[in-house]
Structure formats: C-alpha cells, structure tokens
C-alpha cells in the first residue's frame, strides 16, 4: 500500500475511523457508568463506508429514559460534542449522520432481527463485562441450532432463518 506524504488528505475510511474513535470517547464520557456496550455496524462497521454512509451505532445503556424520543434527547449531548467534526467532514464531501439505536440490556436480551446485521458487521467500541460478546455468541448459537444461513448474492444478503420451515410452524430465535 502506498504511503501518503505529510499532509495528504485522509481516505473516506480513515475519516470515518477518526469519527468512530471520537464517537466511542463521547459515548463513554456522556453515558459513563450507564454505558454497557456500544457497537458500530453497517458499512462503517464493515470498514467500507461511502461519503454518504451514516454511522449506525447500537448503544446499550442502563438506565435509559423510556421511549425513543427521550433517548434521542439524551443522546443529543454526544451529537453536539461531535458537531464540529461532522461539519468538517461535510466540508470535505463526507455527508454523514449518526444513527443510534438505543437498548437496555433487558431489551437486547429480548432480541431483534436488527442484530443479524451485527453478527458479521458489528464492531465493538465498548463492552463492559463482555455483555455484548456473550449475547452475540448466544444469538449465533441459537441461529446455528435453527440451521440459519446468511445468503450472499453480489453485494446484498438475506437470512434464511430456518431452511426446513414448515407452513404454520412457530419458532424462536
């Protein structure tokens, strides 16, 4: 890989790496002891962001306010702390936004199909006591027992959660 000269412009991926590093620091600062886990996923988690990629981030914290909007208002401190960096990125042609998903540990344990995207593409920024690691390993094991498969077609994919599914059958992940 060619080296860049001093002062060379950072690549899109490098710019996102700096943003993610700063995001992790601001999450720790704002949520403090409430922060259980933080996981970046999607194109940024895969390490293949585009200039218009958003930063998908799962924030697991306890306690969290009830309801989405109070949680968004709580997260505003993190967003505000990163506002100058986001503005600089926009000036350089990287038009990104933060796209947080908020869950308590109990809500994570109840599960979500969203977590399928985090199996391969999730990048852990913070994980107190291995909460996320343990959860995602258990989730993967449940998928394995079902025979679930990730089907990749070109640059897209989908999950066949239970290949031997029979009409009317009820199953849990």
Where do the protein language model's features map onto the residues?
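Catalytic core of pol beta-like nucleotidyltransferases
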Residues: 1-34, 45-52, 62-173
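Short, glycine- and small/hydrophobic-rich beta-strand elements in well-ordered beta-sheets
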Residues: 34-40
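Conserved G/P- and acidic residue-centered "switch" motifs that form tight phosphate/ATP-binding loops
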Residues: 42, 56
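Short beta-strand->loop micro-motif that forms the acidic, two-metal-ion catalytic signature
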Residues: 57-61
């Amino acid at each position: 890989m060619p080296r860049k000269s001093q002062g060379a412009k950072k690549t899109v991926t490098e710019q996102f790496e700096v943003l993610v590093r700063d995001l992790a620091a601001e999450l720790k600062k704002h949520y403090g002891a409430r922060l259980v886990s933080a996981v970046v996923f999607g194109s940024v988690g895969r390490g293949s962001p585009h200039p218009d990629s958003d930063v998908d981030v799962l924030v697991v914290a306890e306690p969290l306010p009830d309801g989405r909007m109070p949680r968004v208002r709580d997260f505003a401190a993190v967003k505000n702390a990163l506002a100058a960096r986001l503005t600089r990125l926009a000036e350089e042609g990287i038009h990104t936004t933060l796209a947080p998903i908020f869950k308590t540990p109990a809500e994570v344990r109840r599960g979500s199909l969203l977590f399928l995207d985090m199996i391969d593409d999730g990048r852990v920024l913070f994980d107190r006591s291995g909460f996320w690691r343990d959860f995602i390993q258990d989730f993967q094991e449940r998928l394995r027992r079902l025979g679930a498969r990730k089907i990749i077609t070109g640059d897209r994919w989908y999950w066949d959660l239970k290949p031997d599914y029979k009409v009317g059958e009820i199953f849990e992940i």
